[in-house]
Amino acid sequence: MTAQQAQRFPGTGLQWSLGLIALILAACLISDGLSGGPQLSLPLLLAGALSWLVCWIGVPRLRALKMGQVIRQEGPQSHQSKSGTPTMGGLLLVPCGVVVGSLVSPGDPRLLPIGLVTLAFMVIGGIDDWRSLTKRHNTGLTPKGKLLLQALAAGLFLLWAGLHGAIPTAIALPWGWLLPIGLLIWPLGLFVFLAESNATNLTDGLDGLAAGVGAIVLVGLSLQLMLRGNGGDPALAGYGAALAGAWLGFLLHNRHPARVFMGDTGSLAMGAALSAIALLSNSLWPLLLMGGLLLAESLSVILQVWVFKATKGADGQGKRLLRMAPLHHHFELGGWSERRVVVSFWGISLLLVALGLVLVP
């Protein structure tokens, strides 16, 4: 495919973003109609409007503070034109989702720790972004340093969950099956936080990609929580919808061509929020399935490195499984336009969510 052909992908970034928002809102309204109240649509709309407004006010401020993204030289050369686009947009959107989500069921004790761990990962990502900006190079915290801080925040959340009996000891699977894991939930929970937050971080490489995929998965988790027996779990479902709304409001500023990037500030917080909601609601299986695209992005990096090292010769050169990792760059270098990659990945995530809803535990 030539560059000219790649640009023929129909529609604009705004049109596709509005279409995704309309589709997600319709799904929430259908769920609300079945449950008898605006348990998903209201927090989705409130957080979305608040996030859009805060970003509309805050993005020019980020630009004035010269908080422009430093683009790594190893990435696609077409991305060099994005250099200088304001980053750390997570500072604007994440608090919007947390605040609105906390108002869904103020008396539910689970919402505060979810909000705190989400904000903690936002701060970790913010430190990473800030160090990258001050050094004027796309490297912030050391990988070990970042992982240690993430593990500390996740560990404190898991400790709270364990002390309050809020952490499952058996994983709910489709068709009523349960997988007893006992104390293994502790290392598994830690792994979920680290893997999910870094998966969302890797996915945040194209305009609107992570924001759209993250919102889709968050709403998917919320919908399956409402479909469960005994009235579902409206508190966590509404919280997830609020967070999804915050990322959708941000998406209107982050869609191609992006006015702002969420940075690690937003992507790490997204992974933490997904992990916390999934763990407290025993939705690890739905998260694995619905977030399959996030998993694919992570695996693409792992496999790329493994193949290169396994085939590396004396000259230091090895073979590559993909043109470039993560996976979205592989399609970019294959001639796909950025918008085509993003919309296609959104579509895959929507299909995975639909499959996950069929297989609700």
Curated annotation (Swiss-Prot):
Its main location: membrane. GO terms for cellular component: plasma membrane. GO terms for molecular function: metal ion binding; phospho-N-acetylmuramoyl-pentapeptide-transferase activity; UDP-N-acetylmuramoyl-L-alanyl-D-glutamyl-meso-2,6-diaminopimelyl-D-alanyl-D-alanine:undecaprenyl-phosphate transferase activity. It catalyses: UDP-N-acetyl-alpha-D-muramoyl-L-alanyl-gamma-D-glutamyl-meso-2,6-diaminopimeloyl-D-alanyl-D-alanine + di-trans,octa-cis-undecaprenyl phosphate = di-trans,octa-cis-undecaprenyl diphospho-N-acetyl-alpha-D-muramoyl-L-alanyl-D-glutamyl-meso-2,6-diaminopimeloyl-D-alanyl-D-alanine + UMP. Its cofactor is Mg(2+). It comes from the Bacteria. CDD domains: GT_MraY. It is an enzyme of class 2 (transferase). The chain crosses the membrane at residues 10-30, 40-60, 84-104, 107-127, 147-167, 175-195, 206-226, 232-252, 260-280, 288-308, 341-361. It is found in: Cell inner membrane. GO terms for biological process: cell division; cell wall organization; peptidoglycan biosynthetic process; regulation of cell shape. HAMAP family: MraY. PANTHER family: PHOSPHO-N-ACETYLMURAMOYL-PENTAPEPTIDE-TRANSFERASE (PTHR22926), PHOSPHO-N-ACETYLMURAMOYL-PENTAPEPTIDE-TRANSFERASE HOMOLOG (PTHR22926:SF5). Belongs to the glycosyltransferase 4 family. MraY subfamily. This is Phospho-N-acetylmuramoyl-pentapeptide-transferase. It comes from Synechococcus sp. (strain RCC307). The gene is mraY.
